[in-house]
Amino acid sequence: MRYYLTPLLLFIFFLHPSFANSLPSVPHILVIGEYEIRATPDILTLSLSISETGTEVAKARDSIEARSKELISSLKNIGIEKKDTSSAQLQITPHYNWNNRAQIYVGTEVSRTVEVILRDLSRYDDLIRSIIDAQVAKIHSSRLSSSKEKTLREDALRGAINDAMTKAKIMVAHLPEQIGPVYSISPQSTNTPFPGARLQMAEMSKQSAFEPGTIFFKESLQIVFYLVKEK
């Protein structure tokens, strides 16, 4: 079996000098395979903040504790399991104003962050009512995901491999070489974002229409194949 380097591949090799140290010194071809799967999300994760500011720390703390318990109890009533809720420790932050270089105490903020995972999006309206009733101050973040994420990512990876194989075959279809063994496979960073639910507290009390939309699972990889001379 002999290796043969074509003018085209010489051009590709010198076009990408940054790859010189990671590529074989014999004829080869480098391809990028990509594949994307669209899916309808079925899980919503929210990070919520319950807070209150006052000059009496104990009173503010008791209010946060009561509202936290109300929220957790309400979430349980709509079918959200204990494992799908988590509460952080209370955060106590004093606030001051400055007047003529003098520091004036104006109150202390007591807050707690609660994370909620909703696995049945048909209960979204119930979740919103629970959040409003508990006087949640802010939604820090929201994330839509799929319960089939592992399977979908594996399918996307298989698709990316097939895409790379197809591209490689097309590129050498009219050349005197053929695709040989694989030299290396390297994953490429895709950082596919999950769309946020775009929830605003000011709008929640007016309407709770919610469309989960679509999320994407994208995989990308780089494959280097040896090129071998056709027999």
Label every PLM stretch briefly.
Residues 5-10:
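Sec-dependent N-terminal signal peptides
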Residues 2-4, 15-231:
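Short, charge-dense linear interaction motifs
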